[in-house]
Amino acid sequence: MLRRITCSSSLASPSLFLRFFRQLPRSYSSPTTIAVSGRNIRRLSTPTTLRCICSHSSSEIISEHPPFVRVYKDGRIERLSGTETVPASLNPRNDVVSKDVVYSPGHNLSVRLFLPHKSTQLAAGNKLPLLIYFHGGAWINESPFSPIYHNFLTEVVKSANCLAVSVQYRRAPEDPVPAAYEDTWSAIQWIFSHSCGSGEEDWINKYADFERVFLAGDSAGGNISHHMAMRAGKEKLKPRIKGTVIVHPAIWGKDPVDEHDVQDREIRDGVAEVWEKIVSPNSVDGADDPWFNVVGSGSNFSGMGCDKVLVEVAGKDVFWRQGLAYAAKLKKSGWKGEVEVIEEEDEEHCFHLLNPSSENAPSFMKRFVEFITG
């Protein structure tokens, strides 16, 4: 059931403990060890992948956080999900072309651009809305090159007739927070360096309408979208961002935001543990780090640097009440923009990505597109 107003419903299921940033992929199964030719072979989360784990101390696991990451004593990092990639293509797929462009040579970071194929036939001056997208994955997994994000943005670009730029950023644990926020702001600056039509990337120069720029992201990317909109306001970014879409944002804190928020201490501590041990181990505030505890950090939202915000929440998502509390705080902040809240009562975290054939996925896509085109 779809609701556009906040309401009470049952507490998110404790079974979400291992799915709080991203639902477990359908292919995921707990790692198991089998003996082959006298060696241990550990089956990873992707069933088609096998990796030999030799019996010596360097292969000792010192930290494991399914379904995200495994850390070995010798310093190796093994991601347990979100590692599959698909290539960009200049051959139209679903009437959309794509390509990868490096925006940060120092960190070897790229953006993936998506453009309606028909736009390449348009005369100069026919500009398109510009969508800047930040992927989810708990600041640990996924990338703009993941199939779920490539496919999602292909559909968005086709439906909205826009230019999309999907941003790669450094991920934990190799690069803890705030690296992701530094990179995404650098990407925004790089994109806006094209606003006069003289940047280094031709598609942005030719097709991006900088009077119609939108930020968007899901999960960790939803959190990043908020912080980027806030920084855009603080830095007085010009032209001003038109809107921000915040989908199932990964926002947390040591304590519940209300009586309907997750009360189970095991779940609360489990979410906090991923943040404190993997994502931001240097934070002195733990789960109350202002990057993570957006609602309870005492930050002032009145300087949000865009004109409108769409907040999407899911009733079976562990971040459900945090998302609603975020929207409520934004409405009361004195910010002059418009806030719309959409609640899918019977859906889980990022259902539109993980189950695009679900009953509510088409309506989600319709609202997402209308926010950009409306």
Curated annotation (Swiss-Prot):
Organelle transit peptide residues: 1-52
Location(s), subcellular: Mitochondrion
Signal sequence segment: none
UniProt-recorded Gene Ontology molecular function terms: carboxylesterase activity
GO cellular component, one term: cytosol
InterPro entries documented for this protein: AB_hydrolase_3, AB_hydrolase_fold, Carboxylest/Gibb_receptor
Catalytic activity, reaction form: a carboxylic ester + H2O = an alcohol + a carboxylate + H(+)
Residue numbers annotated as active site: 219, 317, 349
Enzyme Commission number, as recorded: 3.1.1.1
Top EC class, one word: hydrolase
Family label: Belongs to the 'GDXG' lipolytic enzyme family.
Protein name: Probable carboxylesterase 4, mitochondrial
Gene symbol of the encoding locus: CXE4
